[in-house]
Amino acid sequence: MKKPIVCCDFDGTITKNDNIIRIMKHFAPSEWTKLKDDVLTKEITIQEGVGQMFQLLKSDQKEAIQSFILEDTEIREGFKQFVDHVKKADIPFYVLSGGMDFFVYPILEGIVEREDIYCNHASFHEEHIQIEWPHACDSQCQNGCGCCKPSIIRELTRENDFIIMIGDSVTDVEAAKHADLTFARDYLLNECKELGLVHKEYETFIDLKAQFDQIKEVKEWQTKRTSAGRS
């Protein structure tokens, strides 16, 4: 029997909008748009693009950026209930985020433990924001992911695990290639279709939960736990 493991993106997945894009639109000079486009067309890596975007912002903007994000972030419907449901089933749940710790941690406070969150670190010690990459690509990845989701998945999972990825964007494509099943929407949905990856479409965590409970490996895992509880 395979053990289900859930790996979930943050920006545009847990939250309704991409917080990095929101930050750039509100605080950054116009140069950020070319960096974004260059990432999407793969002219530069995600790590290069995101790092350079944040270098456009001054470190003394930290509090303003944090307040802007925390005051206006919308969590996708059903997320907390889904996390509680997964935890109750004793299924590991990890957040793999290309976002920054100074806004990811506060948003997920009380829902996901920090040790289960993998994201980038923003440093405010220099004039402009510098991004540090504690979860950069391992020896098996040369894509310059920044927060390398495939590398984290390799670190977290074992051969007999059933990996479920939840995502929406370009930063989730490589992770989806390593998953047994991907819940996808938006850009990632189109990529899954084009690449022939096993996937299901979702819009909220409410409909995702309904589909999640029908996955064969999840049902088998839940049945095993129920039987063990009775014995």
Swiss-Prot record:
One GO cellular component term noted in the UniProt record for this chain: cytoplasm
Metal-binding found in the keyword field: no
Pathway per the UniProt entry: Amino-acid biosynthesis; L-methionine biosynthesis via salvage pathway; L-methionine from S-methyl-5-thio-alpha-D-ribose 1-phosphate: step 4/6
Family matches, as PANTHER family: PHOSPHOSERINE PHOSPHATASE (PTHR43344), POLYOL PHOSPHATE PHOSPHATASE PYP1 (PTHR43344:SF21)
GO biological process: L-methionine salvage from methylthioadenosine; L-serine biosynthetic process
Keywords: Amino-acid biosynthesis, Hydrolase, Methionine biosynthesis
GO MF term set: 2-hydroxy-3-keto-5-methylthiopentenyl-1-phosphate phosphatase activity; L-phosphoserine phosphatase activity; magnesium ion binding
Function: Dephosphorylates 2-hydroxy-3-keto-5-methylthiopentenyl-1-phosphate (HK-MTPenyl-1-P) yielding 1,2-dihydroxy-3-keto-5-methylthiopentene (DHK-MTPene).
Top EC class of this enzyme: hydrolase
One Pfam short name: HAD
Catalyzed reactions: 2-hydroxy-5-methylsulfanyl-3-oxopent-1-enyl phosphate + H2O = 1,2-dihydroxy-5-(methylsulfanyl)pent-1-en-3-one + phosphate
InterPro entries cross-referenced by the UniProt entry: HAD-like_SerB, HAD-like_sf, HAD-SF_hydro_IB_MtnX, HAD_hydro_PyrdxlP_Pase-like, HAD_sf
Enzyme Commission number: 3.1.3.87
Record family assignment: Belongs to the HAD-like hydrolase superfamily. MtnX family.
Name by which UniProt lists this protein: 2-hydroxy-3-keto-5-methylthiopentenyl-1-phosphate phosphatase
